[in-house]
């Protein structure tokens, strides 16, 4: 970011950043009778650098310089294996895991010492994971269930960031090199039915996450960016819980006409029962598709309900409900033996004014958009 040409700013900022990554991935697949396996080895090296330089309007005064990412090197190497057994024509078991080694080094660790005195410049973490699953097919029905366990290392920003501005909640963020690994426990299940005319599937999963990493307001420290409302430091909650459920369905009304629908819901809470931010409210999608000879017609509705479980404590405000209606039509023909498709349509036909739970600053999404396209398939 370079805002040195904006005269209205009291302090101009120049914030370049670089991230360089190289690595390798190697896979091997094994298959014998009813047993199969995939073994994967991956490794990478990343260097993250971000600078922050402030220029006062009076250039005769001294400028301020800091590293937002203080030359952080990350090296990772991991080995994973996934095994599956067809125990019958109708059922299968999956079992696997991985073991990774994550190394971090901050070249200019003195920036981290301001908030975390004496923290070491280097840190090595062991990242294990395990998962198991079972699938069962009975005629038109399908069932599955699974369990998982895994570790996640803090990201570069979570561990070593220094006054990184988040425009969503308008806070400057400070990393913490002493954060523990996030430890996740997962349970998931699904059930479905499908025949020649229709299908319906329900999926549910639950996560219990120890040492959940999130930003909390700090009582010490002043914001660096003049737009900031405060400073947050990354810290670990004792735990967090995340629950997701979805329902998908499709139905062929007759040969030329079919419909699809989806309903999803998520809920996430911290160790005090408070809401976590960036969790989508109850949402839906529904569509109809009609085909007759070379003609096609599609219409769809999608939207979110009002965000009830939002999180003011983490800088989030409520997002109202919205619905978006889209329509389109197309015609397919051959032009000199080349398949050609002409399409016209409208997105957000009713010109709904809306933003989603994930849009920073509540900046509205696109309004009514009428389009046409020509596709030529050689």
Locations of regions flagged by a protein language model:
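Outer membrane beta-barrel strand-and-loop segments of large Gram-negative receptors
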Residues: 12-27, 76-79, 174-180, 186, ...
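Transmembrane beta-barrel strands of outer-membrane/channel proteins
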Residues: 1, 39-47, 95-101, 145-149, ...
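Gram-negative outer-membrane beta-barrel transporters
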Residues: 89, 93, 101-102, 205-209, ...
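Signature of Gram-negative outer-membrane beta-barrel scaffolds
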Residues: 38-138, 146, 153, 163-166
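Conserved C-terminal beta-signal and adjacent last beta-strands/turns
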Residues: 83, 127, 181, 187, ...
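Residues on the lipid-exposed face of transmembrane beta-strands in outer-membrane beta-barrel proteins
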Residues: 24-30, 79-85, 99, 132-138, ...
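Outer-membrane beta-barrel channels and translocator barrels
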Residues: 31-35, 88-92, 137-141, 184, ...
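Surface-exposed extracellular loop regions of Gram-negative outer-membrane beta-barrel proteins
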Residues: 49, 102-114, 138-186, 206-229, ...
């Amino acid at each position: 970011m370079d805002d040195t040409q904006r005269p209205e700013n009291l302090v101009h900022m120049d914030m370049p950043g670089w991230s360089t990554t190289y690595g390798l991935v190697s896979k091997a697949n094994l298959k014998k009778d009813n047993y199969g396996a995939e073994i994967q080895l991956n490794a990478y090296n990343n260097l993250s650098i971000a600078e922050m330089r402030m220029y006062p309007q009076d250039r005769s005064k001294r400028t301020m310089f800091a590293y937002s990412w203080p030359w952080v090197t990350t090296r990772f190497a991991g080995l994973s294996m996934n095994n599956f057994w067809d125990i019958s024509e109708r059922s299968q078991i999956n079992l696997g895991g991985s073991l990774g080694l994550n190394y971090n080094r901050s070249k200019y660790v003195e920036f981290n010492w301001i908030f975390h005195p004496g923290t070491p410049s280097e840190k090595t973490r062991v990242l294990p994971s395990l998962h198991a699953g079972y699938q069962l097919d009975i005629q038109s029905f399908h069932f599955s269930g699974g369990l998982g366990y895994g570790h996640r290392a803090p990201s570069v920003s979570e561990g070593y960031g220094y006054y990184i501005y988040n425009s969503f909640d308008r806070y400057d963020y400070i990393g913490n090199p002493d954060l523990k690994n996030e430890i996740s426990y997962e349970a998931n299940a699904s059930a479905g039915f499908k025949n020649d005319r229709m299908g319906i599937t329900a999926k549910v999963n639950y996560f219990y996450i120890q040492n959940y990493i999130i930003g909390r307001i700090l009582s010490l420290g002043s914001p660096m960016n003049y737009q900031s409302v405060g400073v947050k430091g990354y810290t670990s909650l004792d735990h967090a819980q995340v629950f997701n459920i979805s329902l998908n369905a499709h139905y062929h009304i007759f040969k030329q006409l079919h419909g699809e629908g989806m309903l999803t819901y998520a809920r996430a809470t911290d160790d005090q029962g408070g809401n976590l931010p960036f969790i989508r409210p109850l949402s839906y999608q529904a569509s109809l598709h009609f085909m007759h000879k070379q003609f096609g017609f599609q219409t769809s509705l999608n939207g979110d309900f009002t965000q009830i479980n939002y999180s003011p404590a983490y800088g989030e405000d409520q997002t109202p409900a919205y619905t978006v209606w889209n329509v389109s039509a197309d015609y397919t023909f051959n032009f000199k033996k080349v398949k050609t498709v002409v399409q016209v349509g409208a997105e957000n036909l009713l010109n709904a004014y809306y933003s989603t739970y994930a849009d920073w600053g509540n900046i509205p999404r696109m309004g009514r958009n009428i389009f046409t396209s020509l596709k030529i398939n050689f």
